[in-house]
């Protein structure tokens, strides 16, 4: 809104404001009430019990509860303080207003949570997994219904999206957020400053998004359409394609296949897009779009890499070009992945 009033694009206005100092990065003022998180959703992690690195600090600063911190902070130690972050002698405790945890066991995190959503466990949900430790795709299959009030992870988040979409009407509509994207490895931006990194804030260079600073990207959020978007595949797959690690390829044929497999949205904001009504639909989307489970996509991915290297790499997947692994396939037998340049 401020950018529109100034007659500037969101990116140009953000750059101008950062250079003037009227706008700052949230990381520069971590104790500012507008900058720290208020809500925390925890999924498949005992964050406050074992998997959080330095979880005692989370107990103090995020929850404001009893903790076991024994060391003193830098201010009391007389240590070197950060130069680009505003220092507060007394940091805020208990920054979070809400903690929601999805788990099938009563972990330490559940004990600290405001709301615990009981999720389905093994043999109660359809899902899949793999690992960089082996080359196979494994299924999780629902043999029985989830116990008592528990639901699968997919159904829980789908329900949250549906309720949020209904409640936000009249409060939130289409909003534009300005987000920053760090300079990514395996991308052209990785060579943005090939002769040495300079700091725009110290006046060593100009602030150029994607070169001397993060990418600055305006993103439109259609909040009332959250549920429709959650349960469908968006249009960008057909507009810009799929990819990773600096390469991309066309996905039109895969999107057409998913329209036949999952059917399409008949109306609403996602009209005509492939549906994701169930966990199996979501699994089929992954299996169809991933080069590791779709031979035709693997060939396209290797061809995309060939454009950069000048050598033909498609022979690495040509013998699997006609192989398309479906969810029912891995239910019958775990399947070996196809060679891919992005894995």
Regions found by a protein language model. Name each.
Residues 1-101, 106-343:
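Domain-level signature for respiratory redox metalloenzymes
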């Amino acid at each position: 809104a401020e950018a529109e009033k100034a007659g500037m694009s969101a990116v140009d206005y953000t750059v101008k404001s950062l250079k003037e100092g009227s706008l700052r990065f949230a990381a520069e003022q971590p104790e500012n009430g507008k900058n720290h998180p208020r809500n925390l959703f925890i999924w498949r992690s005992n964050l406050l019990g074992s998997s959080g690195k330095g979880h005692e600090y989370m107990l103090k600063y995020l929850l404001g509860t009893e903790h076991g911190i024994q060391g003193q902070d830098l201010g009391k130690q007389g240590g070197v303080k950060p130069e680009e972050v505003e220092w507060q002698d007394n940091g805020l405790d208990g920054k979070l207003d809400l903690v929601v945890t999805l788990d099938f066991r009563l972990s330490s995190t559940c004990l600290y949570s405001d709301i615990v959503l009981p999720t389905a466990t093994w043999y109660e949900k359809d899902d899949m997994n793999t690992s960089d430790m082996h080359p196979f795709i494994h299924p999780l299959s629902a043999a029985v219904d989830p116990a008592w009030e528990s639901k699968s992870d997919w159904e829980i988040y789908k329900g949250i999206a549906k309720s949020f979409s209904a409640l936000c009407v009249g409060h939130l509509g289409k909003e534009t957020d300005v987000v920053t994207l760090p300079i990514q490895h395996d991308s052209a931006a990785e060579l943005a400053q090939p002769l040495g990194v300079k700091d725009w804030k110290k006046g060593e260079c100009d602030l150029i998004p994607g070169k001397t600073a993060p990418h600055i990207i305006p993103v439109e959020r259609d909040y009332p359409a959250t549920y429709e978007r959650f349960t469908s595949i968006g249009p960008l797959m057909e507009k810009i394609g799929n990819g990773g690690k600096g390469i991309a390829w066309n996905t039109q044929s895969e999107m057409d296949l998913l329209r036949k497999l999952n059917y399409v949205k008949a109306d609403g904001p996602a009209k005509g897009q492939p549906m994701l009504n169930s966990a199996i639909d979501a699994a089929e989307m992954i299996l169809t779009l991933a080069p590791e489970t779709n031979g035709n996509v693997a060939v396209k991915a290797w061809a995309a890499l060939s454009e950069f290297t000048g050598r033909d790499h498609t022979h690495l997947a040509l013998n699997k070009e006609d192989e398309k692994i479906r969810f029912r396939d891995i239910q019958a037998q775990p399947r070996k992945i196809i060679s891919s340049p992005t894995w």
